[in-house]
Amino acid sequence: MSSYLFTSESVSEGHPDKIADQISDAVLDEILRQDPKARVACETYVKTGMALVGGEITTSAWVDIENLTRQVICDIGYKHSDIGFDGHSCAVLNAIGKQSSDINQGVDRESPLDQGAGDQGIMFGYATNETDVLMPAAITYAHRLMERQAQVRKKGILDWLRPDAKSQVTLKYEDNRIVGIDAVVLSTQHSDNVDQKTVHEGVMEEIIKPILPAEWLSKETKYFINPTGRFVIGGPMGDCGLTGRKIIVDTYGGAARHGGGAFSGKDPSKVDRSAAYAARYVAKNIVAAGLADRCEIQLSYAIGVAEPTSIMVETFGTGKVANELLVGLIREFFDLRPYGLIKMLDLIQPIYRQTAAYGHFGRAQFPWEKVDRAEELRAAASLK
């Protein structure tokens, strides 16, 4: 019997890097509302008392960058100097330019179907049947802990909570099946006037216990709640934040490979984002069809070229049919050209700010989480 531990982490919407991601995607959403053909690559940097929004944007839309940035920061919960960051009074700097015409000529085509990829690169998608959302369990529960932290904070259930937080979940596996939770780490920013006993008890009762499956917890499970003993200075006062620095948190928590490209602030012509979503969609439908228990897809593209330069499938010995057959089914049922996958997943819509915290995958509201091709795939593979 093989036994091993596997760990994934998540961060809250108030983590500095996630503040940056949410600002970048809020800018993208507002532009897409006005200009579906916009080209957007928006980057954000946050530090004590300031937010810098930059990048390359070509659009007919007009967006009040300063007001939108302040709104996002305040919505997260940073709206008073006592917390260390105040969306009402922080400086907002705008350093946005236009996308290079050299890139435009490779992407834009007379026929939309011939639209080229916005850059070269490799993208991965993954699915596993170990959770109901066909995502790895460790990252799924790490995200849910962070969502619960925000819910408890915003409802005032624990009024000493502050926006910045991190979680980490270590699962124990035997023969590739989860048998329990070995360790939980949860660090949360808090007010200066609360003692650590109160923090520990509050986090256990209001955040950890309502989220983690009771059958996975035991007297051997280890809990590390604010293990440094104090977490008052947080958010951009504690660390600077930058768009695109939480790419493993955004995807599969280390359970699958990553092509290296970040998502937030990029319009769907950037295959770093859109093709990673498409790869997840393909992998999830393969697992939902029962063609594999685990499935990882790799796609690759060349800048200015519509067709993917490669498609790879890995099922880790769990496939019910050959990987080569799965590649053929992918080519038959999924249009993975940039314009094709944008249409297939209806990506030209202002949905991206909500992706920028708690993971881009495993959340039913997003179109790449549909399993509407599973029955077709199953039938085509001749599985009864």
Swiss-Prot record:
Main location as per UniProt: cytoplasm
Annotated keywords: ATP-binding, Cytoplasm, Magnesium, Metal-binding, Nucleotide-binding, One-carbon metabolism, Potassium, Transferase
Cellular compartments annotated: Cytoplasm
Pfam families, sorted: S-AdoMet_synt_C, S-AdoMet_synt_M, S-AdoMet_synt_N
Entry's EC annotation: 2.5.1.6
Residues annotated for Mg(2+) binding in this entry: D17
PROSITE patterns for the chain: ADOMET_SYNTHASE_1 (PS00376), ADOMET_SYNTHASE_2 (PS00377)
Cofactor descriptive note: Binds 2 divalent ions per subunit.
Annotated ATP binding sites: H15, D164, A165, K166, R230, F231, D239, R245, K246, A262, K266
Catalytic activity, reaction form: L-methionine + ATP + H2O = S-adenosyl-L-methionine + phosphate + diphosphate
Pathway(s) annotated for this protein in UniProt: Amino-acid biosynthesis; S-adenosyl-L-methionine biosynthesis; S-adenosyl-L-methionine from L-methionine: step 1/1
Flexible loop as annotated region, ranges: 99-109
CC annotations in GO: cytoplasm
Gene Ontology terms: biological process: one-carbon metabolic process; S-adenosylmethionine biosynthetic process
InterPro entries documented for this protein: ADOMET_SYNTHASE_CS (IPR022631), S-AdoMet_synt_C (IPR022630), S-AdoMet_synt_central (IPR022629), S-AdoMet_synt_N (IPR022628), S-AdoMet_synthetase (IPR002133), S-AdoMet_synthetase_sfam (IPR022636)
Cofactor(s) needed by this chain: Mg(2+); K(+)
Record-listed K(+) binding positions: E43
Gene Ontology MF annotations: ATP binding; magnesium ion binding; methionine adenosyltransferase activity
Binding residues for L-methionine: E56, Q99, D239, K270
Complexes and interactors: Homotetramer; dimer of dimers.
NCBIfam families reported for this sequence: metK (TIGR01034)
Described function: Catalyzes the formation of S-adenosylmethionine (AdoMet) from methionine and ATP. The overall synthetic reaction is composed of two sequential steps, AdoMet formation and the subsequent tripolyphosphate hydrolysis which occurs prior to release of AdoMet from the enzyme.
Family according to the record: Belongs to the AdoMet synthase family.
Protein name, per record: S-adenosylmethionine synthase
Higher taxonomy: Bacteria, Pseudomonadati, Pseudomonadota, Gammaproteobacteria, Pasteurellales
This protein's encoding gene: metK
